[in-house]
Amino acid sequence: MAGHSKWANIKHAKARQDAKRGKVFTKLIREITVAARLGGEDIDSNPRLRAVVDKAFAANMPKDTITRAIKRGAGSGAGDNLVEVRYEGYGPSGVAVMVDCLTDNKNRTVAEVRHAFSKCDGNLGTEGSVAYLFKQRGLITFPPNSDEEKIMEIALEVGAEDVTTNDDGSIDVTTLPEDFEKIRNAMKAADLNPSHAEVTVLASTEVGLDKDSAEQMLRLTEMLEDLDDVQNVYSNADYPEEVL
């Protein structure tokens, strides 16, 4: 057993922002457009596009909206002025934070990101200052009372990296990014339906927070995710049970 699930930390940090559906849709449409521009409109041959379309469906975005965003990115050059940039820094209690952005003005974006850090007892770092503390992985989470033995069996058969059973009975299966689709499809083929599945960024080690620091870290996350240019915020914060 290993505490609460990785998705519990990710989900809680995103919960307040996800309530602002209009802003969430705007960010997803931007990401869909860029993914289609860079990799084409065929979801089967564009893993990045497939991943963000899955997120869009999970957020209850209408299919027509998704299709229009894909067509716009693949056909019209929409999103050509957007560049990807990642900022790294430290939050309260030395929590490592990475901020992924899509922007048409890096000077504006870095100023806004720096302001959020400074307002929440943090500071913006240099490139590479915290990236080594994270790794990109597929994360497939199953709810409590799932068939642990069957999940473990399939995971071993198809080459999952790790399987962890959490205190609440949920199960996390982690994969290499390139194996994510194969393993998720194998689970579904075995009638094992995850409550959540995505390629994300996971911390190699976590920093435990007390209640005050956790609230401050959540404030920083909310301020960052409220910025139009910010797509994702990752941290190695381990939130206490009382705020989850």
Swiss-Prot record:
It comes from Coxiella burnetii (strain RSA 493 / Nine Mile phase I). InterPro entries: Integrase-like_N, TACO1_YebC-like_2nd/3rd_dom, TACO1_YebC_N, Transcrip_reg_TACO1-like, Transcrip_reg_TACO1-like_dom3, YebC-like. The keyword tRNA processing does not apply. Keywords: Cytoplasm, DNA-binding, Transcription, Transcription regulation. One of its GO terms (molecular function) is DNA binding. It is found in: Cytoplasm. GO terms for cellular component: cytosol. Transmembrane segments: none annotated. GO terms for biological process: regulation of DNA-templated transcription. Belongs to the TACO1 family. Its main location: cytoplasm. This is Probable transcriptional regulatory protein CBU_1566.
